[in-house]
Amino acid sequence: MQICLNPIIAFGPNDPPLKYLLNLKDIVQNSECKATKEILDYFSVEESTWNPQKVAATEDLNIHILRSLESHNTVAIQGPPGTGKTYRMGRLVAQLLSERKSVLVTALTNEALKVVASKEDLKPYLESGKVSKTSLTIDERHELPKLVANEGNVCNATPGHLSLATFYISSGWAKDMLETTPFDYVIVDEASQALLPMIAASKKLGSKVVWIGDQKQLAPIVKTNEDKINTCGWSPIVKGFDTLCNNIPMPTFMLSDTF
């Protein structure tokens, strides 16, 4: 994977910490990591590999995902707004926790993580102190008093527990991770908001990885001229989820029904 020497700066709803970008830089430069190389060193294909199985609202998505993960380590799911992506993610996490799996859900924003924590299927685990979140704010403590603060924002993979962390925090965990893979499952929410190195970073953190997002959603906002992005070949990096779905073979699903 070739990257121009000029820095590329990406912005979400708020400017991300510089350390987030440095984390991703370190992940890209670590050429010895097999897990990330599977994503970063992808072969661009002329014809898209995206050929998802459509899943109706009446179907149990968990069955499809878990069956696929018996023979693969990764799954990609897409769904337009209103197709219940977060609801279905909550159901998946609840089933995994019931099987005493360690689960990380990571997303660009703290707001997205809060929405996950508030899902009805996760209420028993929230009430029993089995859901923790990094950088827990006073407002979040007020809204979800049973949500456990991850003091020190440490990588806290624990069987039967859900960890919630932003891309910024989880990218740091991935950067520092050597050979061990801490979580049984990593679920990347808002995957369309992830740069390609963040997509790759998630593979360092979980034995099984589920990416879920909307391929048609806007990619991360980048404060760099679009012509320069195209000239330097940065578009696949910026549109990480799109690059993943169109170039890397894996089980894929499309949520087609709105609730």
How should each PLM-predicted stretch be described?
Residues 23, 30-32, 44, 100, ...:
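Short, flexible coil/linker elements and helix-boundary hinge sites characteristic
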Residues 46-149, 157, 162, 166-259:
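ASCE P-loop NTPase helicase motor core
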Residues 29-53:
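Charged, amphipathic alpha-helical linker segments immediately N-terminal to NTP-binding catalytic cores
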Residues 21, 36, 245-248:
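A beta-rich soluble binding module of mature secreted/lumenal proteins
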Residues 20-23, 27, 38-42, 64:
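Charge-rich, solvent-exposed alpha-helical interaction surfaces
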Residues 1-30:
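Conserved ASCE P-loop ATPase motor domains encompassing nucleic-acid-directed helicases/translocases
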